[in-house]
Design a protein with these regions (language model features):
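C-terminal and late-domain segments of enzyme folds
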Residues: 165-217
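Hydrophobic/aromatic beta-strand patches that form the interior of the parallel beta-sheet core
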Residues: 55, 91, 159, 175, ...
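Glycine-rich nucleophile elbow surrounding the catalytic serine of serine-hydrolase chemistry
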Residues: 98-100
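Hydrophobic/aromatic residues located in beta-strands of well-ordered beta-sheets
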Residues: 12, 39, 90-91, 113, ...
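N-terminal beta1-alpha1 cap of cysteine-dependent amidohydrolase-like domains
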Residues: 1-90, 119-124, 206-217
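Gly/Ala-rich beta-loop-alpha elbow adjacent to hydrolase catalytic centers
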Residues: 92, 96
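Pocket-forming structural segment of enzyme catalytic cores
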Residues: 77, 103-180
């Protein structure tokens, strides 16, 4: 009965590739989904392929997260097929967003997924004026309309934990920035690909609304 109940529900997969503690991501998506959407947590490539939407979380360094993806046979190819070939909705969170880049410079020079051309570099702390990692609540400035920002007020506060920033080559993909040392990119949208540098799962009711907007696409 339980399996049959889910048979016609939308399926959202959170990719678990051992990138750190993703329990808050899982709990937030399940809270928003309730019994309307099936939330799956897996690295199984066949389950990812059959999903309606995918969430790519990321905690730790750029290199460790990329290595985590590469260590699971076929996972990167499956994500490329899902997001680039089939153009299904995908949301990257924190380092999950950063891995959209061509290259990252944390720990060592590491090739990213290359979905959105650009690089990931360390935030300029202006000779120690700004503490790194950047931890805590910060206002976001919505600079372009984004489907995941539906009914989100500009200058809302979101929760951040990061020392590196994504710098895309095409500024048109930027949907929001935050002021910390400089205007740091904190959200992007390119076709079916969405990303947040902040943690919506840790950003109270507004963050849950962003998750709901993604699920509702």
């Amino acid at each position: 009965m339980y399996q049959r109940f889910f048979i016609n529900l939308m399926n959202v997969t959170i990719v678990d590739y051992k990138s750190g503690n993703i329990s808050s991501v899982i709990n937030s998506f399940k809270e928003v989904a309730k019994d309307k959407v099936k939330i799956e947590v897996t690295s199984d490539i066949n389950k990812i392929k059959s999903s309606d939407k995918v969430v790519l979380p990321g905690q730790g360094s750029f290199k460790s997260c990329v290595d985590g993806l590469n260590n699971i046979n076929g996972l990167v190819d499956t994500l490329n097929e899902f997001a680039i070939t089939n153009k299904k909705p995908l949301l990257g969170i924190c380092v999950g967003l950063q891995m959209f880049a061509d290259i990252g410079y944390e720990d060592t020079e590491t090739k990213g997924l290359g979905w959105i051309s650009g690089k990931v570099s360390k935030i300029n702390n202006q000779n120690g004026k700004y503490k790194l990692p950047h931890i805590g609540w910060n206002q976001i400035n919505i600079v372009n309309e984004s489907k995941i920002f539906k009914d989100i007020e500009n200058n809302s506060h979101m929760y951040f934990v990061h020392s590196y920033e994504f710098i895309p080559n095409d500024k048109n993909v930027i949907s929001a920035t935050t002021d910390y040392s400089s205007n740091i990119v904190c959200a992007v949208e390119k076709d079916n690909i969405f990303g947040t540098q902040f943690h919506p799962e840790k950003s109270d009711k507004i963050g849950l609304k962003i998750i709901d907007n993604f699920i509702s696409l």
